Amino acid sequence: MQEENQHPEQDDISEAQDAGAAGSLDARIAELEAQLAEQQANVLYVKAEGENIRRRAAEDIDKARKFALEKFSSELLAVKDSLDAALVVENATVESYKSGVELTAKQLLSVFEKFHITEINPLGEKFDPNKHQAISMLESDQEPNSVISVLQNVRPE
């Protein structure tokens, strides 16, 4: 017991150091908690901003698609008008119908060109599944796996 009380000043200093260290640790913990809260708020902000960007991009894509479809549709109306005009002609000859259909086909091709839809003619080419769609396989005098008949020859570029 005597040894415990021999250096009371040392005990006071040790307790003071411990109290100072605890206060310093409490301050450091409070500082780190504040930084953590700030970073969590930043994460939430960045996440919300990312969602806003995705939403705006989706809206822009929808608007562009709608505008393109409206423009394409309005261009096709002129083709439909030409076809309707051919239906109301009385006493038309086969030659006049043929001429009208040719002009209407040119009008339609013009619309296709305007919207980058091109006409292709793969007859005789080797079948490419990336460009062509096969309906069936038929025996032919042509090279094996080549296109021998075309049902649709217009496609987007």
From Swiss-Prot:
Pfam families: GrpE (PF01025)
Region (Disordered), start-end ranges: 1-21
Cellular compartment(s): Cytoplasm
One MF annotation (Gene Ontology) recorded for this entry: adenyl-nucleotide exchange factor activity
GO-annotated biological processes: protein folding
Superkingdom assignment: Bacteria
GO cellular component, one term: cytosol
InterPro entries in the record: GrpE, GrpE_coiled_coil, GrpE_head
UniProt KW keywords: Chaperone, Cytoplasm, Stress response
SUPFAM superfamilies (UniProt xref): Coiled-coil domain of nucleotide exchange factor GrpE, Head domain of nucleotide exchange factor GrpE
Function: Participates actively in the response to hyperosmotic and heat shock by preventing the aggregation of stress-denatured proteins, in association with DnaK and GrpE. It is the nucleotide exchange factor for DnaK and may function as a thermosensor. Unfolded proteins bind initially to DnaJ; upon interaction with the DnaJ-bound protein, DnaK hydrolyzes its bound ATP, resulting in the formation of a stable complex. GrpE releases ADP from DnaK; ATP binding to DnaK triggers the release of the substrate protein, thus completing the reaction cycle.
Protein name, entry field: Protein GrpE
Annotated organism of origin: Methylovorus sp. (strain SS1 / DSM 11726)
